[in-house]
UniProtKB/Swiss-Prot annotation:
All copies of domain ABC transporter, residue ranges: 2-238
Protein name: Hemin import ATP-binding protein HmuV
Organism of origin: Shigella dysenteriae serotype 1 (strain Sd197)
Family the entry assigns: Belongs to the ABC transporter superfamily. Heme (hemin) importer (TC 3.A.1.14.5) family.
UniProt function note: Part of the ABC transporter complex HmuTUV involved in hemin import. Responsible for energy coupling to the transport system.
Keyword terms of this UniProt record: ATP-binding, Cell inner membrane, Cell membrane, Membrane, Nucleotide-binding, Translocase, Transport
Molecular function (Gene Ontology), one example: ATP binding
EC number: 7.6.2.-
Localization terms from the record: Cell inner membrane
Length: 256
């Protein structure tokens, strides 16, 4: 479980998170949605311990984040940021194996190879990471995070992803979310991601959090949260919300 209680964070007089309280029980894919500047990435950084709130508290497995050591926290949660540039000529395989650093147990070549296959990175193994496309880099970073969290026996872990599909083609978007769902069901992973694609969130997320101006304005199942009224108010766009006949999830269409 991860929880946030009364999170407040301000920058240059502007509240980026404004008294945010949330509890994610686990066993879910959570999608945080909202317009640009809503506070989504700021909230994610606070939930992961990268950004200390001005007031309020975050807890992971009922323990305050500031009471975790850096090493132990890294074994239980992993974070993909929006940008993951590197200045040095590491190979893809070397980048992925960096994920094992908190465990100090060597490279674990078998697990690394398994995870590279899961993330469709085998063909990239010997490439210079800096020469990859944005989408290829996102796949490599996901593999690094899984190597960081992987244990021989599945145990609860948290995976935080900030716009993980921003550079992915449609095939790899689908592959990513199918993999995340598999990890939730088979490996006791919990996933929290910031997204802009409303239809991806509607199709794959178990829980949707809507943010506006630093506040959480809705939190619940996609069919309860992604309504035409709520989305029109939030984004100021002319849209129609239909029902996907395949799975009864919301289907968001931009009007002409």
């Amino acid at each position: 479980m991860i929880s946030a209680q009364n999170l407040v964070y301000s920058l240059q007089g502007r509240r980026l998170t404004d008294n945010v309280s949330l509890t994610f029980p686990g066993g879910e894919i959570v999608a945080i949605l909202g317009p640009n500047g809503a506070g989504k990435s700021t909230l994610l950084r606070q939930l992961t311990g990268y950004l200390q709130p001005d007031s309020g508290e975050c807890r992971l497995f009922n323990k305050p984040l500031n009471e975790w050591s850096i090493t132990e926290l890294a074994k239980h949660r992993a974070v993909m940021r929006q940008n993951s540039h590197m200045a040095f000529p590491f190979s893809v395989q070397e980048v992925i194996q960096m994920g094992r650093h908190p465990h100090r147990t060597g490279n674990q070549d078998n697990e690394t190879a398994q995870i590279m296959a899961l993330c469709d990175c085998q063909a990239l193994a010997n490439r210079d990471y800096r020469q990859l496309s944005g989408g290829e880099q996102q796949r490599v970073q996901l593999a690094r995070l899984l190597v960081q969290l992987w244990e021989p026996t599945p145990s609860p872990k948290w995976l935080f992803l900030d716009e993980p599909t921003s550079a992915l083609d449609i095939h790899h978007q689908q592959h990513l979310f199918r993999l995340l769902r598999q990890l939730v069901h088979e490996r006791q992973f919990n996933v929290c991601c910031v997204l802009h694609d409303l239809n991806l969130a509607a199709r794959y997320a178990d829980r949707i959090v809507l943010m506006q101006k630093g506040k959480v304005i809705a939190n619940g199942k996609p069919q309860d949260v992604l309504t035409q009224q709520a989305l029109t108010m939030l984004y100021g766009a002319d849209i129609t919300v239909l029902e996907d006949p395949a799975n009864h999830s919301p289907l968001i269409v931009l009007d002409h």
